[in-house]
From Swiss-Prot:
It comes from Pseudomonas savastanoi pv. phaseolicola (strain 1448A / Race 6). Disulfide bonds: none annotated. NCBIfam families: PRK02166.1. The lineage of its organism: Bacteria, Pseudomonadati, Pseudomonadota, Gammaproteobacteria, Pseudomonadales. It comes from the Bacteria. Belongs to the UPF0149 family. This is UPF0149 protein PSPPH_0305. Signal peptide: none annotated.
Amino acid sequence: MPIQNSPYKAFATLLNSGGHQVSPAELHGLLLGRSCAGAGFDNEGWFADASVLLETEPQDNIRQALIGLQEMVKGELTGDDMTVVLLLPGDDEPLTERAAALGQWCQGFLAGFGLAIGDKTLGTEAKDVLEDLAAIAQVQDALDESEDGETDYMEVMEYMRVAPLLLFTEFNEPAAPQPKPSLH
């Protein structure tokens, strides 16, 4: 049976090959956080923020992966489906590893959001979501390898698929509708 390399593991391998010890989850959280806060999708701003987390300017192969990650996030946030897929270890990994990565993702999201939000006013719902993410970032040690732990993790994951979308819709201008061609 061939070994399946998850996107998370592939990205971790790429980052490690460049000497970066950062988690793919934290990097993805950073990108999604800054995007949800209204930073837009230009590559240079993303590279600048990623470089701080990576502690160095990314090499070309990592830059290309960062561009791909940003294009994926842009498609998720602005597409018709508005579905967010978190870059986390697969369900076959131990719960402790998945919970730790989820905590890292939340930390990255909060950092990215904080970098990009500027002086925008946060509504009650946005504050609640950010407080929830801060609490989830601390949950990594609370989940144990049990059926209850798995259930708790899955409930948190369901929330995590929606939370970024709530913030994105609050802090980003909706795309202008495309004019429909008229027949004359």
